[in-house]
Amino acid sequence: MKIARNSMRAGMLGILALSLSAVYAQERAKPGVTDVEMKFQAGDSPMGKVEMHQNINPKAPPMTKAEFERGKQIYFERCAGCHGVLRKGATGKPLTTDKTIASGTEYLKVFINYGSPAGMPNWGTSGELSDADVDLMARYVQQEPPSPPEYGLKEMAASHKVLVPVSQRPTRKQNSFNIENIFSVTLRDSGEIALIDGDSKKTIAIIKTGYAVHISRMSKSGRYLYVIGRDAKINLIDLWMAKPDTVAEIKVGLEARSVETSKFKGFEDRYAIAGTYWPPQFTIMEGDTLKPLKIESTRGMTVDTQEYHPEPRVASIVASHYNPEFIVNAKETGKILVVNYRDFNNLKITSI
């Protein structure tokens, strides 16, 4: 009798346990999700805690924010010069998303890796980019291009530094270098230039500059050397110092290619001018301090189709020896701007 009662109690407890389990399971159950899916597919994804780049185009392949920032850096350093900051094309073809997404990731990887006969470098097979970076860039150019910020007088003034005031600089040359025979050699990826004595073939100095110096220009007097990096940082180097070095610096934009100084009689070394790819503008500065004085935009209508262009990049700038003028070349609008600085407060700009 006792055995029967104990068996009955055990059975009732088992039924109670099963009932509670069923109720608990019902509380946790998700409609349309099987037990197998709950057990084997509900684990955390490694990407769950990674902040993703949010693209307004749903067809673009996924990228993390870190990948997007890496792609943006590579694009600026390697691609923007030919394809444009806004990716609308220049020397290279447009890389707008209507074209890149239609091409697809694998197609783009082939072009980035092997290049093309039209002049596209073989970034992958040359060793410049790793396989991972090639894949990253193929996905990056399928994202909507980020809108770069504008860069005005406020930003320039914040970056401006006079490291050696004019009053503390040499009043006469303090070295024996033949400044008419000095080479300024760009050390691209290290962000430096090397000054080479053309007479002795020895290195005078290696000077920290902006990224990938694009051009070095001598002042009319021969005393100052102006160098500008692709990141739009300008170094003013005094060649009269015992060891030539930077005496002033400024960043005039986000990407640039050109710098020049006034060379007309009576205005020698008075002004410096720099043109930027982004923002599309040129800036005139004090020649001996790089203090920014005036900014002029190059945005406007193209000469052929008379359409507004948001990114007319400033290419070369040349100073006239015969008139108080800078000749500024604006690429995408197809214009040459002759900037007369005789009356500086009322610049006369002639468009050709």
PLM region spans:
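Short coil/turn segments that connect the beta-strands within blades of beta-propeller domains
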Residues: 180-181, 221-223, 268-270, 323-324
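Extracytoplasmic electron-transfer domains, predominantly the class I c-type cytochrome c fold
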Residues: 27-43, 86, 90, 96-146
